[in-house]
Design a protein with these regions (language model features):
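Short Gly/Thr-rich strand-loop-strand
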Residues: 50, 55, 59-84, 109-148, ...
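A mature extracytoplasmic/lumenal domain signature
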Residues: 108-111, 120-122, 156-159, 235, ...
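Surface-exposed amphipathic alpha-helical segments
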Residues: 158-188, 295-327
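Bacterial N-terminal signal peptides
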Residues: 7-16
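Positively charged n-region of N-terminal signal peptides that target proteins for export
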Residues: 1-5
Length: 327
C-alpha cells in the first residue's frame, strides 16, 4: 500500500469515527450521526464525505435533500432526477489546502440502472473519460461519475485554483467511500457495435417515444445519412404485454389511407410505417421485447439492425405452461 493510499484510508476512518453534522432540508438539524430523509439511508454519508482527505478539508456540515425538497437545490432539474427515481442527495463543500474549493454532490438513485441513466443523460461529449466509479468523465473544472446506486458530481468554481488532478483525487476518495462500484448495465450489450454513435446509449425510464406503454426502455443512435438513426429496445414483463403495446403503437402510427404495413419477418411479429418526424419506422417483437428502428435510410438497413439487436437480447427463462402468453 502506498503512503498516499494509507493516508486516505486513515483519514476516512477518522472521519467516520467522528461522525459528520448533517443538516436535512426542511427539517430541524439532526446533529451528529446519520439522519434519515425518509426511512434509513443505506450507506454511510460520513464515509463517503469524510472530514479530511490529503490536501482537502470538508466544511463542518453536510446538507441532505429528499424527493420533496430536491427542488430547493436544483429547481429546474429536479423533475428529471425524480423521473430517474432519485432517493436522496448529500452535498458538502471541500476546501483545498493549497487554495480553491470544490462542491461534492452524491445523488442516490433507486438502483444502478437509474444511476447510469441520469449519468448518461448529463454526459458531456467533450468531457474526458477518467477511471473513477464504474465510469466517469472530467471537464475543465468538474468530475462526474456513477457507482452502484450513486451519481456523483464534483464541481470547482470557474477559475478555481484546484487543478483537475486534485479534483480527480477527491472524486476517487469519495468513490471509495461508496463501496463496490458494480458493473455497467447488461443492457448496453444489446446494441450492435457496428455504426453505434459513441456515448449515445440512454436509459429511458418512462414514456419512450412519447408512448406511455414504453417504460424502462433503452435507446441509442447509429451513424447514417443524412442523420443518425435511432434504435429503441423495450423489454416487457410478458409476451402478452409486448404484443399489446405493439398493437397500440401500430394503431398510433397508422394514418387514414396509409396504415402500417405488416412484415412476415423477422421476429414474432413486425410492421413498418412512415412518420413525419422520424421517417421510416420498423417495429419488431421478439417474445416479450420490442425492437424499434427509427429514421434508417432504408427498410433493409433497419431490418438488418433490428435483427442483429434481437440476437443480443437474452430470451427470458421459460416459465410454467400458460404464463407470459405465447409467441
Amino acid at each position: 500500500m502506498t503512503r498516499m493510499a494509507c493516508a486516505v484510508l486513515c483519514a476516512v476512518a477518522a472521519a467516520v469515527a467522528a461522525g459528520p453534522t448533517i443538516i436535512v432540508a426542511n427539517q430541524i438539524p439532526g446533529g451528529r450521526g446519520q439522519t434519515a430523509i425518509s426511512g434509513s439511508i443505506p450507506y454511510s454519508v460520513g464515509r463517503a464525505l469524510p472530514n479530511t482527505l490529503p490536501g482537502w478539508t470538508r466544511s463542518p456540515k453536510i446538507t441532505m435533500f429528499g424527493r420533496s425538497s430536491l427542488w430547493e437545490h436544483i429547481d429546474g432539474a429536479a423533475e428529471q432526477y425524480l423521473a430517474f427515481e432519485f432517493q436522496d442527495l448529500a452535498t458538502a463543500t471541500y476546501a483545498r489546502t493549497a487554495g480553491g474549493t470544490a462542491t461534492v454532490e452524491i445523488y442516490r438513485m433507486i438502483d444502478p440502472q437509474h444511476a447510469y441513466g441520469i449519468y448518461a443523460q448529463e454526459l458531456s461529449p467533450t468531457a474526458t473519460r477518467v477511471a473513477v466509479g464504474v465510469e466517469g468523465r472530467a471537464g475543465r473544472n468538474s468530475v462526474k461519475f456513477w457507482s452502484g446506486d450513486f451519481y456523483v458530481k464534483l464541481v470547482a468554481p470557474s477559475g478555481s485554483a484546484a487543478p483537475p488532478a486534485d479534483l480527480l483525487a477527491l472524486a476517487t476518495a469519495v468513490a471509495g467511500g461508496l463501496g463496490e462500484p458494480g458493473k455497467p448495465p447488461a443492457q448496453l450489450s444489446w446494441f450492435p457495435p457496428a455504426g453505434l454513435v459513441a456515448d449515445s446509449i440512454k436509459f429511458v425510464p418512462a414514456d419512450a417515444l412519447g408512448q406511455s406503454m414504453f417504460s424502462s426502455a433503452w435507446e441509442a443512435k447509429y451513424a447514417g445519412t443524412p442523420e443518425p438513426s435511432t434504435l429503441v429496445i423495450v423489454p416487457f414483463a410478458s409476451t402478452d404485454g409486448a404484443r399489446g403495446a405493439m398493437a397500440k403503437y401500430e394503431s398510433f402510427l397508422g394514418r387514414p389511407g396509409k396504415p402500417a404495413k405488416k412484415l412476415a419477418a423477422p421476429g414474432d411479429g413486425a410492421f413498418t410505417a412512415q412518420e413525419g418526424y422520424y421517417g421510416l419506422i420498423v417495429v419488431v417483437r421478439s417474445g416479450p421485447t420490442l425492437v424499434i428502428s427509427l429514421g434508417a435510410a432504408s427498410e433493409a438497413a433497419a431490418t438488418a439492425l433490428v435483427t442483429d439487436a434481437m440476437r443480443r437480447v437474452p430470451s427470458p427463462p421459460a416459465g410454467p405452461k400458460g404464463t407470459g402468453g405465447t409467441p
